[in-house]
């Protein structure tokens, strides 16, 4: 279809198919062959020449012709697995069938009455045409299984998708069912040592086959996001990830190795991506997407597996279906394989951060969201890999790009999904002690970010970015505040030397969160204060030595803690924020309508990811208490949440407090009414004893030395605090409490929605799912 005449002929065939009032016989090869016998086809031609309206008309008004077209395409693919497709014209015919199915399958999923079509056996005359009248296993198999088996076979078809073997005898058509596909894995890496020579044509054919597989698995897009709809197995994925797919292992290793071995920089020649076409990147991108989809299957099945690998304590009528892809991932155990995976993913995640003197001289990849989901799946389903990631400072090569993307996306409503996945990866990592230990490594890499310049460790970097998200992020991020502070709480017992920047920013967050206006505006806002106090207590109890900056900052801001201890509980003060909200309600409505009009102005679009449900609302956290005796002083340093703001320049603080207050007012419940009894119920539980005792001991000492020696320089005071001790003066150290992420149905549903939202948005060439009636998430267009 590359030439004008071939496009015209193809278009005429489409018109004939969609306008015929009678069914076209499956045996009319002259008619059907014109859909795939043209040369120089491109998938863009197929999508352009078959508009959505005509596909729906064919489906609704002449369903038998649509069914026969699908039968004939699958037949063509199946026959190719029996005879091979070494001939270029045969290969083009196969690709045209693949493109037709990729175009039509979403519209079959769109109609509930058609979803079972591929799971029916080939009826009547079509069966005789399909299998030559022979009674075979395929003849009794649903059409979907025949299609998936054929595509899997074609993924390892010599001279089409893989290099042919060296032959000693005469060339003969090769039955793909006799091929050992483990010898044809696409790339070296896990389970395969030799790297086949690159071939752009093979990469293009592989890409189109994988896109068809992805399309076949996308039925979930057309189901509303309810647990009932998604608790039933996806038959396509169930078969492809079962023992019925004899190529499951080579497909898994091919996909994984493709992603982890991809180097977008090549030989490092500047602007090489502008001079040479990169056929590998589209393949790597769809490989990452397909791998994530295959690893997601069964995550919401009736008998899920928990994070620690034990079966959930529930019984269901349907037995669980083994997912070979999850099984293969969980069984990877060699350190060289872990090294290959971790460094491959880290290399790609760090690609957008590369700085060069020549602008745009390096190729930048943009599938970081798929990589983050894939990394999550790896850590979630292979605990040995998670422990390997955390046992060295290599985990910081994952942390830095995650923080980069979090900071970059914090104000963009369309990237809320990216914010959630990044935060939840860090929450998962923070549940392990080694993550906190690794944060002590000095931060020397300078990433292009709009954060203050600082000298410190990766922990400082973490807190600076978190502070920026909380004080300067989109208002819909407030449900993530708990998660952000939980991460800092988890690592705080191991933070040996907070910088002054970090200390000031943590104190600034406490100052903002502890105002009566914020505390009394919402039923859960006081939890943030508890988290911050727990951070301070952990550092004071377990890492007092070396944290003189934080101690000094607490002394300077001691009035915050005194105000918390004396928080008013009288009705007038408690209900003042609500009266203020009521009095400003009309003004806020006017401002909201104006800002909404500005935000949704013509020419902007809202992505699918924007409509994703809030993830943190469904988060399960498992609390793990470590005895104080087991708590070692680890090599970790906390990062400050933002640039240091001296008390003498409160302008920035006012702006940031205003931002936090805005978030509080937006999320405050209209039915919530703070009462003195409610305030008293949690006020008496505020963990202030350790901090108050420290202030009671150190404040007089600091005041005395300042008077006696006439000290005015804070560095001298900090030096004095460095040599101080509180041994025997503080309460008995409390047990370290680690809050670990635990999967549940809500977060699993969120991950599935987010994953398919990414795939929908990323696949625009061709636009596989565009203009179809997607139900899993909301598509807003302008």
Q: What spans do the regions from the language model cover?
A:
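Generic structural signal of hydrophobic/aromatic residues within well-ordered alpha-helices
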Residues: 13-14, 31-35, 46, 73, ...
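Compositionally biased, low-hydrophobicity segments enriched in charged and small polar residues
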Residues: 4-9, 177-179, 183, 394-398, ...
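Intrinsically disordered, low-complexity boundary segments flanking structured domains
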Residues: 17-20, 55, 132-133, 137, ...
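Ordered, helix-dominated protein-protein interaction surfaces in large eukaryotic regulatory proteins
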Residues: 3, 37-38, 48, 79, ...
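N-terminal alpha-helical scaffolding segments that mark the starts
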Residues: 1-117, 678-685, 689-697, 701-712, ...
């Amino acid at each position: 279809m590359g030439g004008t005449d071939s496009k015209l002929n193809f278009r005429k065939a489409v018109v004939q198919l969609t306008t015929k009032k009678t069914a076209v016989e499956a045996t009319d090869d002259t008619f059907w062959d014109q859909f795939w016998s043209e040369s120089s086809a491109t998938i863009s031609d197929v999508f352009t020449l078959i508009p959505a309206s005509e596909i729906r008309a064919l489906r609704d008004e002449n369903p038998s012709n649509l069914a026969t077209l699908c039968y004939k395409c699958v037949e063509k693919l199946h026959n190719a697995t029996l005879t091979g497709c070494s001939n270029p014209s045969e290969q083009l015919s196969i690709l045209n069938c693949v493109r037709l199915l990729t175009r039509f399958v979403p519209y079959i999923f769109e109609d509930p009455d058609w979803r079972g079509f591929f799971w029916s056996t080939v009826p009547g005359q079509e069966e005789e045409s399909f299998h030559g009248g022979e009674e075979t296993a395929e003849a009794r198999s649903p059409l979907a299984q025949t299609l998936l088996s054929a595509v899997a076979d074609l993924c390892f078809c010599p001279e089409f998708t893989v290099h042919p073997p060296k032959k000693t005898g005469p060339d003969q058509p090769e039955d793909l069912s006799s091929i050992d596909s483990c010898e044809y894995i696409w790339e070296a890496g896990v389970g395969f040592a030799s790297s086949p020579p690159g071939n752009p044509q093979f990469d293009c054919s592989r890409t189109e086959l994988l896109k068809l597989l992805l399309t076949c698995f996308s039925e979930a897009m057309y189901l509303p996001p309810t647990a009932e709809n998604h608790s039933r197995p996806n038959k396509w994925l169930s078969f492809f990830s079962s023992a019925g797919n004899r190529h499951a292992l080579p497909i898994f290793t091919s996909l994984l190795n493709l992603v982890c071995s991809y180097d977008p920089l090549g030989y490092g020649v500047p602007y090489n991506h502008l001079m040479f076409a990169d056929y590998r990147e589209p393949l790597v991108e769809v490989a990452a997407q397909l791998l994530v989809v295959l690893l997601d299957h069964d995550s919401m099945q009736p008998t899920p597996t928990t994070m620690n690998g034990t079966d959930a304590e529930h019984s269901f009528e349907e037995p669980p279906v083994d997912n070979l892809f999850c099984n293969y991932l969980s069984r990877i155990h060699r350190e060289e394989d872990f090294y290959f995976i971790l460094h491959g993913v880290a290399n790609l995640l760090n690609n957008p951060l590369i700085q060069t003197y020549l602008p745009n001289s390096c190729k930048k990849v943009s599938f970081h969201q798929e990589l983050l989901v894939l990394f999550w799946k790896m850590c979630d389903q292979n605990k040995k890999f998670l422990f390997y990631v955390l046992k060295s400072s290599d985990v910081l090569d994952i942390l830095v790009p995650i923080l980069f993307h979090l900071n970059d996306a914090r104000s963009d409503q369309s990237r809320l999904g990216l914010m959630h996945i990044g935060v939840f990866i860090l929450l998962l990592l923070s549940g392990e002690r080694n993550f906190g230990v690794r944060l002590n490594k000095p931060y020397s890499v300078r990433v292009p970010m709009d954060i203050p310049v600082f000298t410190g460790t990766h922990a400082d970097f973490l807190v600076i970015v978190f502070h920026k998200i909380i004080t300067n992020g989109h208002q819909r991020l407030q449900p993530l505040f708990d998660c952000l502070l939980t991460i800092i709480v988890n690592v705080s017992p191991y933070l040996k030397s907070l910088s002054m920047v970090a200390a000031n920013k943590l104190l600034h967050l406490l100052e903002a969160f502890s105002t009566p206006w914020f505390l009394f505006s919402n039923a859960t806002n006081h939890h943030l204060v508890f988290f911050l106090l727990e951070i301070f207590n952990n550092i004071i109890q377990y890492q007092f030595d070396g944290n003189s900056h934080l101690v000094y900052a607490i002394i300077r801001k001691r009035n915050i803690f005194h105000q918390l201890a004396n928080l008013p509980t009288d009705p007038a003060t408690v209900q003042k924020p609500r009266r203020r909200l009521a009095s400003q309600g009309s003004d806020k409505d006017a401002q909201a309508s104006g800002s909404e009009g500005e935000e949704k102005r013509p020419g902007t679009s809202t992505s699918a990811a924007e409509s994703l449900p809030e993830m943190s609302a469904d988060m399960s956290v498992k609390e793990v208490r470590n005895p104080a005796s087991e708590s070692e002083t680890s090599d970790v340093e906390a990062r400050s949440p933002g640039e240091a703001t001296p008390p003498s320049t409160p302008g920035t603080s006012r702006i940031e407090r205003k931002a936090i207050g805005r978030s509080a007012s937006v999320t405050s419940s209209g039915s919530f009414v703070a009462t003195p009894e409610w305030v008293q119920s949690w006020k008496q539980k505020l963990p202030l004893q350790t901090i108050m005792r420290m202030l009671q001991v150190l404040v007089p000492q600091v005041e005395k030395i300042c008077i006696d020696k006439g000290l005015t320089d804070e560095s001298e005071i900090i030096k004095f605090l460095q040599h101080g001790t509180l041994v025997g003066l503080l309460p008995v150290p409390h047990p370290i409490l680690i809050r670990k992420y635990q999967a549940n149905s809500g977060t699993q549903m969120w991950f599935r929605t987010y994953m398919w939202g990414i795939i929908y948005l990323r696949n625009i060439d061709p636009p596989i799912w565009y203009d179809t009636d997607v139900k899993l998430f909301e598509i807003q267009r302008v």
